[in-house]
Structure formats: C-alpha cells, structure tokens
A protein has these predicted regions:
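Edge beta-strands of extracellular beta-sandwich domains
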Residues: 174-186
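Extended substrate-binding grooves/exosites of carbohydrate-active enzymes
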Residues: 1-176
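Low-complexity, acidic Ser/Thr/Pro/Gly-rich terminal tails and inter-domain linkers that flank the onset
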Residues: 185-203
Length: 272
C-alpha cells in the first residue's frame, strides 16, 4: 500500500493490507519491537507472535461491516501456507545460521511509473547495496537510529521503473557475499508447479503441498494475474483442496478450482 506509512488499524477499499510490515492492528505492534526487547533485555525468554499462520476468523482490522473478509491477515504465513514478506523479516532475525536475502515489494506495477515506491530488504547480513536497472542507489546498513533501521534495510525514496531490481549483500567485513534479483514480469505464459515432496507413501493418507505460480516466459512470477486454475489428477492419487491466501476469497477449498491471489496458490494432493 502506498504511501508507506506507520499506521494502526488501517483499512482499504480492497479489504487488504500492506506487505511493508509497518501497519498493525490496534492491539498489536510491529515485529521490530519484539526483536528489540529480546536483544536488549536479558530477562526475556522468547517472543509470542499472534500469529504464525493465518486462520479462519478474526479478520482484524476488518472486524465489522467488512464482508467478505473472513480470515486473519496478521500471520507470518498465509492461509495457503505461503510465506508472506514478513516471514523473511522474522527469518533474518531468528535464523542466524541460514542466509536470508529478500526484496519487497514485487516489481510489476503498471501505472506507477515515476512514483515513489520504497524498497525494503530483509537479510541476516548487516549491509546491502541496491541497484535498479544497473544504477546504484547506495548502500544501507543496519543501525540504531530507529527500531526498523535495526532490523531492516530500507530505501524510502526509490521510484518505480520497469526492469530489474538487484540487491548485493555484504558481510561484517565488507565482502560481497550474496545477491538477489527481482524483475518486472512480462505477459503470463505458463503455470509452474512445485511440490514440497517428490514421493508419497501409498497409504491413502500422505499429502503433498504443491505451490502453483502464474509465470512469464522467463519464469518470473506474474503478481497481478489472478486467473482461475482448474485441477485434475491422473493416477492413484487424488485432489484434496486448494487455497490462495486471500482473506476476502470465498471459494470452497475442496472444489478442484481456485483463483490465484497475487499470482499464486497452494493445492493439496493425497496419496491413493
């Protein structure tokens, strides 16, 4: 959501919320506050997050007069078991052993050309440099000037132009150690299926979760394509359900069809 501003209980005409993780429910706070408490006070023993996984019910801040909102929006992972942007913020702080380098938002914004579109980076590395179409927008390093600056790298004044966003991360010694690229999507070309498992036990119970993406000819996610996708299964397995993570979507999970949400959804298959 633009402009990117700290807000409590913000509501929008599309009944969605911002992925920049600067908006919270009236009773909540940004994750950075909890991170700082844990880092600054030896007496803390952990963090309580409400909630790790979206669920049906309690669609705050759309609690009243907000049909068709019917599921929570503040989870780290959405109702389709897909990680949200904030998942990578938590991961960058909680998991110091694994590399995290995540760019948000996506970079397919037809009609926003020339408009301010901030870029956030969630990473376990202390510093990163941002490039848009080959032009450097400088390095940012985590610092103590604000809560968000302690845990995020933020370029607040960048303007949208179609093309490529690249981030190069640097370790504490100033060595370039990782990079990530996000590109503007072209026209939708095909459907990409990625299963979390290659084999199932033939017990009639085992499940596979298949991430479904609408992508362009180069494999870039098409985040504005929300077409309906129909499912059928050949062989001894069977289709069980699908979800797209949209808190306003009323399609039934068990039917073999579902609209994508931001170009994605999850389908569940069961062994025969």
């Amino acid at each position: 959501k633009f402009p990117v501003e700290d807000k409590k209980g913000a509501k929008y005409e599309d009944h969605q919320c911002s992925s920049y993780d600067v908006e919270v429910c009236p009773w909540s706070n940004i994750p950075d506050e909890d991170f700082a408490l844990a880092d600054d006070h030896h007496w803390t023993i952990g963090q309580f997050v409400w909630t790790g996984f979206d669920y049906l019910g309690e669609p705050s801040p759309y609690d009243t007069d907000s049909w068709p909102n019917h599921s929570s929006m503040f989870g780290i992972i959405d109702l389709a078991s897909l990680p949200k942007d904030r998942y990578y913020l938590y991961r960058s702080v909680w998991n110091k052993e694994a590399e995290t380098l995540h760019i948000l938002p996506h970079w397919t914004w037809p009609g926003r050309e020339g408009e301010v579109t901030p870029i956030f980076v969630y990473t376990n590395y202390p510093t990163a440099e941002l490039f848009i179409n080959g032009k450097s927008y400088g390095k940012q390093s985590k610092n103590n000037s604000s809560l968000k600056n302690r845990y995020r790298l933020m370029w607040m004044d960048t303007k949208y132009e179609p093309g490529e966003v690249k981030v190069v991360a640097y370790d504490k010694n100033g060595k370039a150690v990782a990079e990530k690229v996000v590109r503007t999507a072209g026209k939708p070309h095909h459907i990409e299926l990625v299963s979390n498992r290659n084999e199932l036990t033939a017990d009639g119970k085992d499940l596979a979760y298949v991430t479904v993406k609408v992508v362009d000819k180069d494999g870039n996610l098409c985040p504005t394509d929300n077409r309906q996708i129909n499912f059928s299964v050949k062989g001894t397995g069977k289709y069980r359900a699908a979800a797209n993570g949209d808190p306003t979507n009323l399609e039934q999970f068990h039917l073999p069809k579902m609209h994508a949400f931001n170009g994605m959804l999850t389908a569940i298959l069961q062994a025969g």
